[in-house]
């Protein structure tokens, strides 16, 4: 495999490489066999793991031969009866073949991703979910509209195989992939004409399909946007508005027309910014409403032309940042005006200038979060705290730790908001719900619980505030916390409550367009 990676540095070679012989490498199936046992051993009961789960390379070769035949289809996506030994062995070898197929297809995909990203400084990938917000703070205040483009998941298996054919010219290596996709589509759990590119049964296989599908969409979209941006020429050959010349010269490129002595001046378009978190791209645009409509129309036509997909209207939504709020991962995003007063003194005269700048203002969705807490039985629908009866069987330390963990995660995730008053309302709900839970467990009252525990009840709840007070210039921490935001870079996934609220928002939009 390492030798294959080294040989893949040449584009002309790895696009025409022969991947099908890799299916008959015993080392490949040894790797997939070990990976399958590691994953399945954590999910299957001990009685289902037997010493007979040994890999037979001869059986694997027979399965590959069955895949190549149209009349013999192996079942990869049906839940087999664990009591039937034959079904279990069949599922075992099917999973091994599926793991090997994923390993083979990951080779050209990893090489392509590595060499396509090189030289593109604007395409960066970060692990933290909060790495998106510094980019939004830099780009959003200069934009007036955003496009919330959601990636469609349903795609026909043959269209998905054709996208692989653009980069893999070894046709026999795609026959197993085609058989697997059609087998999944025709399974009793998924009787439909399209395949859903989301992780469901085999996590590694479907994660690979999702990553490849998103990468293919972005690569084609970026190339088209760059081509359209560089091909638009100005109606006049002179510079547009010579004011701020040094600023605008950075966004102007010159290229010569063939068989002509004249040069064409073209503007790089710095007004369209693209960012994606997970499977949800966001495009920030600065321009007239007609430009926003053209970009939205282009995205819809782009998906229909390249992937033969009919995108529903709600898949590409446009918002004006000055009037509406857009829902980002767990936040309401808007742009607010921030007035700044500048005093300039020249000799004996004093001038006061009033400047207005735009600033991104992320808002914490307090009311929806309280509704989610009510659904989890921490409070009622009006926000009144109640006891968590399902936790009364736990120890006191476990109850305190669970409530403390919920508050820590919320405060840690929403530390980037200016207004934290709503967070302290949620803190009040959680602390009082914790006291009521302990009182219900000990068949006592809240006053007795607070008297017995004392500061221990609220000690952990104030731990996050102490972290902010320990920052430099702690004497001004209280006033500074209302003006500054802290984006923590160690958050690798969205908060569960914020994720639930985001799914509810997406479902509301889908239901709105389905009516």
Swiss-Prot record:
Usually encoded in the trnK tRNA gene intron. Probably assists in splicing its own and other chloroplast group II introns. Keywords: Chloroplast, mRNA processing, Plastid, RNA-binding, tRNA processing. Disulfide bonds: none annotated. It comes from the Eukaryota. The keyword Chloroplast applies. It comes from Pinus halepensis (Aleppo pine). It holds the Pfam family MatK_N. Belongs to the intron maturase 2 family. MatK subfamily. GO terms for cellular component: chloroplast. GO terms for molecular function: RNA binding. This is Maturase K.
């Amino acid at each position: 495999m390492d030798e294959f990676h080294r040989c893949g540095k040449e584009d002309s070679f790895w696009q025409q490489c022969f991947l099908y012989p890799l299916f008959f490498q015993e080392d490949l199936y040894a790797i997939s066999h070990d990976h399958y046992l590691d994953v399945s051993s954590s999910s299957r009961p001990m009685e289902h793991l037997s010493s007979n789960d040994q890999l037979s390379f001869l059986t694997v070769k027979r399965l590959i031969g069955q895949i190549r035949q149209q009349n013999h289809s192996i079942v990869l996506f049906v839940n087999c009866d664990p009591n039937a030994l034959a079904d279990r062995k069949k599922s075992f070898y099917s999973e091994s073949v599926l793991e090997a197929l994923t390993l083979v297809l990951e080779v050209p995909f990893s090489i392509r991703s590595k060499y396509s990203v090189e030289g593109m400084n604007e395409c960066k990938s970060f692990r933290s979910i909060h790495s998106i917000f510094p980019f939004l703070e830099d780009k959003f205040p200069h934009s007036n509209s955003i496009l919330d483009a959601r990636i469609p998941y349903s795609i026909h298996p043959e269209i998905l195989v054709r996208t692989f054919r653009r980069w893999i010219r070894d046709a026999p290596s795609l026959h197993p992939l085609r058989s697997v996709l059609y087998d999944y589509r025709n399974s009793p759990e998924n009787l439909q004409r399209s395949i859903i590119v989301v992780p469901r049964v085999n996590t590694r296989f479907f994660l690979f399909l999702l990553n490849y599908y998103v990468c293919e969409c972005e690569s084609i979209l970026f190339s088209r946007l760059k081509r359209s941006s560089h091909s638009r020429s100005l109606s006049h050959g002179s510079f547009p508005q010579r004011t701020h010349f040094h600023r605008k010269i950075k966004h102007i490129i010159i290229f010569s027309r063939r068989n002509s002595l004249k040069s064409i001046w073209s503007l790089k378009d710095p007004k369209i910014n693209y960012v994606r978190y997970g499977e949800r791209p966001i495009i920030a645009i600065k321009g007239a409403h007609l430009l926003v409509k053209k970009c939205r129309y282009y995205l819809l036509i782009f998906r229909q032309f390249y992937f033969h997909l009919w995108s529903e209207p709600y898949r590409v939504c446009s918002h004006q940042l000055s009037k509406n709020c857009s829902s980002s991962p767990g936040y309401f995003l808007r742009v607010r005006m921030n007035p700044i007063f500048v005093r300039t003194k020249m000799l004996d005269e004093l001038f006061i200038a009033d400047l207005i700048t735009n600033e991104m203002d992320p808002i914490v969705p307090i009311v929806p979060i309280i509704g989610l807490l009510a659904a989890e039985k921490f409070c009622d629908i009006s926000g009144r705290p109640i006891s968590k009866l399902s936790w009364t069987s736990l120890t006191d330390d476990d109850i305190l730790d669970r409530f403390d963990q919920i508050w820590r995660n919320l405060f840690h995730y929403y530390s980037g908001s200016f207004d934290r008053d709503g967070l302290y309302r949620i803190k009040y709900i959680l602390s009082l719900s914790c006291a009521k839970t302990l009182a219900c467990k000990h068949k006592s009252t809240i006053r007795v619980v607070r008297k017995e525990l004392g500061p221990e009840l609220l000690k952990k709840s104030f731990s996050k505030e102490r972290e902010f007070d320990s920052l430099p210039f702690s004497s001004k921490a209280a006033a500074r916390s209302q003006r500054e935001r802290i984006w923590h870079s160690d958050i690798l996934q969205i908060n569960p409550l914020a994720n639930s609220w985001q799914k509810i928002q997406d479902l509301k939009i889908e239901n709105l367009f389905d009516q």
